[in-house]
Amino acid sequence: MIDLKTKAFDIAQNFTISLDGPAASGKGTVGLILAKKFSLKYFQSSIVYRQLAFNCINQQIDITDIDAVIALSKELKLDNNIDLENEDIGDIASQIAVISDVRNNLNENLINLVKTTPRIIMEGRDIGTVVAPDADLKIFITASPYVRAIRRYNQLQAKGKTCILDEIIQQIILRDKRDKERKAGPLLPALGAFIIDTSKLSAIEIVEEVTNYIKNKIT
């Protein structure tokens, strides 16, 4: 059996990291840096739900029409030319993500991506528990709703997008509730995952914490 240290540093070996946590907890920043450090493909699983949400809006599909949403999820194709970083799209994505058949359909694509990509770090809500339960390293990142709302607000402001902090806070609280209470793939740490609360940590400190954890696991 190939040891974890070899998997991490030998780019000829398969190496998978699952990176889970609630919205705006710092997963994206950490994931991109770790991907570069260990020569991994980085994939944000929420993009498939945002793409589906965009398609529902574009095709004027009422998301309360469960059968129509499920049918659309079976033929999903990603369009990299679309800006999906929109709070309205994110809110709809959160609502349709609670539909079990939608998650099952989209997870088939994610599971296949993990299996066919030798070196990958996949970010999401249920990667370590459902999509990649056999990941070599499992990380769960969290932070208080207020801190996460501030981060999302600053991200959107930096992109020149109009947003209201109080609305973002309420959206995050509601998304957390949906994520934790859904029947399929609820948000929770995978067994054996490294759990880190980033509420009082900067992006650099978060990366240092995770990197130190990885170093301890592979030495």
UniProtKB/Swiss-Prot annotation:
GO terms (BP aspect) = pyrimidine nucleotide metabolic process
Top-level taxon of the source organism: Bacteria
E.C. no: 2.7.4.25
Kindly state which keywords UniProt assigns to this record, in alphabetical order.
ATP-binding, Cytoplasm, Kinase, Nucleotide-binding, Transferase
Q: Which GO terms describe its cellular component?
A: cytoplasm
Q: Which terms does the record give in the GO molecular function aspect?
A: ATP binding; CMP kinase activity; dCMP kinase activity
Any idea where this protein resides?
Cytoplasm
* Top-tier EC class: transferase
Q: Is Signal found in the keyword set?
A: no
- Can you tell me which residues bind ATP? G21, P22, A23, A24, S25, G26, K27, G28, T29
Q: From the record, give the transmembrane residue ranges.
A: none
SUPFAM superfamilies per record: P-loop containing nucleoside triphosphate hydrolases
Q: Which reaction does it catalyse?
A: CMP + ATP = CDP + ADP; dCMP + ATP = dCDP + ADP
Family membership noted in the UniProt record: Belongs to the cytidylate kinase family. Type 1 subfamily.
The protein here is known as Cytidylate kinase
Organism of this sequence: Rickettsia prowazekii (strain Madrid E)
Gene, per the UniProt record: cmk
